[in-house]
């Protein structure tokens, strides 16, 4: 095994910015960007279809991110098996994975990455639910002291922001009908 350095990018939505929205949790801002847990999935991209070679869970204490500074970068290292083959590295954040088996085709693995939430999304509390994210990158091989940067993470949720600029009208409640209680983490 080889320790691989990773750097993820969590992009802000331009309008409105993450700083102006309500999901702030407690103590720090920009909780929509927070990465609390990471799983690394390594697929053999030299074969068709690509198959799962390795699954590594990253310890949460090894994830570095400064949300108070508005940084959208997440840094950590993970032990990966060396490989001379072309691989696709998928990063899954904030979603508990289970039951993945080596040799499973990539599409089957991605189709099994489903996040379920049966009730209201906890967005503004001590125990808020971090948004599941997915990103991937292909690399020619995994060799000693490799560093993999700029993996762009995509949030699994769509957000509806309501803006009311009038002073004589107050929105008291908003309801979303026919919403899903589960969804795919991967956009693929």
Model-derived features with residue positions:
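Sec-type signal peptide cleavage vicinity
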Residues: 1-188
């Amino acid at each position: 095994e080889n320790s691989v350095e990773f750097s993820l990018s969590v992009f802000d939505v331009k309008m409105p910015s993450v700083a102006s929205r309500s999901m702030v949790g407690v103590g720090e801002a920009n909780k929509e960007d927070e990465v609390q847990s990471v799983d690394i999935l390594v697929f053999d991209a030299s074969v068709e279809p690509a198959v799962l070679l390795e699954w590594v869970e990253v310890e949460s204490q090894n994830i570095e991110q400064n949300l108070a500074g508005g940084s959208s970068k997440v840094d950590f290292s993970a032990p990966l098996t060396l490989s001379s083959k072309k691989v696709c590295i998928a990063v899954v954040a904030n979603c508990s994975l289970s039951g993945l088996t080596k040799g499973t085709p990539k599409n089957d693995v991605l189709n099994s990455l489903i996040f379920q939430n049966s009730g209201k999304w906890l967005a503004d509390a001590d125990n808020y639910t971090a948004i599941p994210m997915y990103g991937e990158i292909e690399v020619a091989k995994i060799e000693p002291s490799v560093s993999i940067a700029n993996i762009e993470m995509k949030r699994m949720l769509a957000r509806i922001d309501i803006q009311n600029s009038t002073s004589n009208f107050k929105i008291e409640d908003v309801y979303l009908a026919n919403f899903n209680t589960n969804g795919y983490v991967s956009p693929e």
